Amino acid sequence: MAFEQRIEAAMAAAIARGQGSEAPSKLATALDYAVTPGGARIRPTLLLSVATACGDDRPALSDAAAVALELIHCASLVHDDLPCFDDAEIRRGKPTVHRAYSEPLAILTGDSLIVMGFEVLARAAADQPQRALQLVTALAVRTGMPMGICAGQGWESESQINLSAYHRAKTGALFIAATQMGAIAAGYEAEPWEELGARIGEAFQVADDLRDALCDAETLGKPAGQDEIHARPNAVREYGVEGAAKRLKDILGGAIASIPSCPGEAMLAEMVRRYAEKIVPAQVAARV
């Protein structure tokens, strides 16, 4: 089964469990609204790619890890869009959850998706409890403080911001989780896979900064120019467009070089190359 089918099937099963017969109907429908359409599902696809490169001897556990990670990511988007943070009106081409359902339900939706992510891992633990425990730990570390997406959001409240630490926590954290969890699910050590995740995450953030500066809202599927409006730290402000484009090229080259030795190393390198082609904004593609 293709990665996309595996991810969507496991995601649908997780959401269906959260929409049980006694669930409040508005919150139940908000759960599905928050995770669909799924976009590129970049993080879970990366996780399954690493697991496959490492042999993927427990595909059910890999699927659970992929969905747990994506649920956390979707939760972070719901919370990021709230009025107290970005106050965004559009996400993935449709009204944000708080616009469609209300702010209280958006908060509950994000909270529910976070809990659901860890529940998915707990339910998958019977066959490989040690691996499952490592997966829970890896995901928790990259979700909370001091190195997770919560820390990334927290950096935006600081007067002095370390751009590298900010990017590593806000965006890199879940990419590190993706590569490490893919390895763990297949029985490999997590630590050697941190650099690959960090580099892919930084590349994604720099590319996102370039898109935010250069693309319009229709192209993005969300409001453009948000970094400038909210005075957020970003690579374009730090390096300029040309400098950010060069930085992106360097990061992507380093990502391929950082892939640890594994049976599917060549396949994974090709996946990273294809991913690079997708994330580079058209306006700067010729420069990288």
UniProtKB/Swiss-Prot annotation:
Presence of the UniProt keyword ATP-binding in the record: no
Gene Ontology annotations of biological process type: carotenoid biosynthetic process; chlorophyll biosynthetic process; geranylgeranyl diphosphate biosynthetic process; photosynthesis
Disulphides: none
Binding site for isopentenyl diphosphate: R43, H73, R92
UniProt-annotated binding residues for Mg(2+) 2: D80, D86
EC number from the UniProt entry: 2.5.1.29
Entries under InterPro entries matching the protein: Isoprenoid_synthase_dom_sf, Polyprenyl_synt, Polyprenyl_synt_CS
Similarity section: Belongs to the FPP/GGPP synthase family.
Record's protein name: Geranylgeranyl diphosphate synthase
Species whose genome carries this gene: Cereibacter sphaeroides (strain ATCC 17023 / DSM 158 / JCM 6121 / CCUG 31486 / LMG 2827 / NBRC 12203 / NCIMB 8253 / ATH 2.4.1.)
